[in-house]
Amino acid sequence: MCDILLNVLNIVFIGIAIILVIIC
């Protein structure tokens, strides 16, 4: 369960980083 949660958080964090790069 913890591994799945960490994976989801990782994907969300990477997605936010990509969006910030596109905006900037």
Swiss-Prot record:
Source species, domain of life: Bacteria
| Any one GO CC term of the record | plasma membrane
Topology relative to the membrane, per the entry? Answer: Single-pass membrane protein
Q: What is this protein called?
A: Protein YahV
Q: What induces it?
A: Expressed in both exponential and stationary phase; expression is slightly higher in exponential phase (at protein level).
Q: What is its main location?
A: membrane
The listed locations are: Cell inner membrane
Which keywords does the record carry?
Cell inner membrane, Cell membrane, Membrane, Transmembrane, Transmembrane helix
* Record bears the keyword Repeat: no
Transmembrane parts of this sequence: 4-24
Presence of the UniProt keyword RNA-binding in the record: no
Q: Whose protein is this, by species?
A: Escherichia coli (strain K12)
